[in-house]
Amino acid sequence: MTTPGEDHAGSFYLPRLEYSTLPMAVDRGVGWKTLRDAGPVVFMNGWYYLTRREDVLAALRNPKVFSSRKALQPPGNPLPVVPLAFDPPEHTRYRRILQPYFSPAALSKALPSLRRHTVAMIDAIAGRGECEAMADLANLFPFQLFLVLYGLPLEDRDRLIGWKDAVIAMSDRPHPTEADVAAARELLEYLTAMVAERRRNPGPDVLSQVQIGEDPLSEIEVLGLSHLLILAGLDTVTAAVGFSLLELARRPQLRAMLRDNPKQIRVFIEEIVRLEPSAPVAPRVTTEPVTVGGMTLPAGSPVRLCMAAVNRDGSDAMSTDELVMDGKEHRHWAFGGGPHRCLGSHLARLELTLLVGEWLNQIPDFELAPDYAPEIRFPSKSFALKNLPLRWS
């Protein structure tokens, strides 16, 4: 990446593709290779996609030029997208306030409770002999554990998931339905009431503590944080549960290895998240002219940073299209990088390690349903399997 403001555009050829035509639904390896092969900057559907490792990592580390706020805070929306749609120094404050609640030390205190819920959820499935893993587990599991930590009632889980699904569907439709609008309103009303209740009657949960600490978040900030976590904060675990169980169903030798050596589950989880991140790109908007891959992007250019393409770019032995199970946890960028690196990465790893370990404990051998062909929902902002039918005896 060239220094911002330098102009070396010259005669640059800008590839133009249609996002929906990329072969992502069946094979992300082929899809991201198609994009990388097209060029370092590819224009699709109004966005400039950066596909090369050097450029993606430089942009992730430079929020001054590649702004999250301009990309993620909807104009005119009074609800702040905390902390995602803020750049330093505002983002630095949010990170400082929130980080302690998602640190390994804090999560270790919650581990017994999270483990109990994990065991119970898989136990409810194990006796069936079959399940549709996305609907029966992947969509529910991260929500249930989130509610435990965050301080929302467990009995509201399914209602919150329903609202979340409706609001996300609304964002993908050109014209929202009355039901979509009603769901969005009901979710906001629910969260407003819960934030106010925790402010009046605080407990040990995250929702209470962020409102009463040394530097408490305001009511509107907590509402924005809660709204973001419900709508977009849990997709990584949902997607990774599905892809983890898919790979384990395909690979009996891998199942046996992880049962015999549970410490390798962490390696497996890192590889699943590297290969199949639910949020494969990071949106940004440039704040000043910047030259990338030979092209000068003017200020105000909408950009998407393709972390998933970087994770599979073949630049080293660990950045391949295959699981690398060599006993080591290799670095990747599925959780982003720079100041906006995923705040919940430790929680995601913990949840996935618990789930895979307990699944193999209760359901050691299982297989895919006959004639099943895995596909993700595409085009979509979040990559996850449409469904995952499993069976066992």
Named regions from a protein language model:
Residues 1-393:
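Cytochrome P450
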